[in-house]
Amino acid sequence: IYPGPGVTDVKMLSYWYPELEGTNGDTEVYILDSGVEGASMLVLGGTHPNEPSGFISAVMLIEWCEPEEGKLYVIPRANNSAFTCTDPLEAAPTRFYIETGNGERWFRFGSRATNPIDQWPDSEIYVHAASGQKLSGSEVRNLNRAYPGRTDGTFTEKITYGITKLIEDEKISMTVDLHEASPEYTTVNAIVAHEDAVGLANMMLW
């Protein structure tokens, strides 16, 4: 990643939750501060590293975006651990290549879930701590199923706790989590938003 002119600082997620320091859960947080008072926004890429569009979109913000007011936080590898492996039995590549005007660039292709080296074994049934919802055991390593996280929870829950701490401490006004879907997936081209934010989410379609 080549930070663009809009990037004013780079911190690690462990800045907000020190227990992540030195682990595969720690990850870069790029800060783009306009210097003008305004709202703050967090963009997450790489929640599922086998969905490269979300990651690449976050990288483009880091390299090209220059906010006119307020502050933008971008985490391109939200689940950094999942970038260190691929999904078994899926014949997934470890990297992919993009031709650019400055030559070929390559990017890591990862897994949908935290590397089992960092968190194992999976339970038969995963009970989401905050809601009590029961899910498939493999979902225990899915970053999107671990919010708001816990300090005494799984490795994945500790990552989401760090992200939640960032949101709380920096008083983030809005968070966008970037994903990708295959063409045959039933929710392709979908935006999932809280009922209080549906109007704002609809604006992203235009």
Give a label for each model feature:
Residues 1-29:
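Short glycine- and acidic-rich boundary segments immediately preceding or forming the N-terminal edge
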Residues 27-37:
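Short beta-strand-to-loop junctions in surface cap/lid or active-site-entrance loops
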Residues 34, 45-49, 180:
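Glycine-rich His-Gly loop
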Residues 39-48, 176:
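Short beta-strand element of the alpha/beta-hydrolase
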Residues 48-56:
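Di-metal (Zn2+ and/or Mg2+/Mn2+) metal-binding site signature of metallo-dependent hydrolases
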Residues 52-53, 68-206:
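Active-site/substrate-binding loop(s) of hydrolase catalytic cores
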Residues 57-70:
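A short, Lys/Arg-enriched amphipathic alpha-helix followed by its capping loop at the start of a domain
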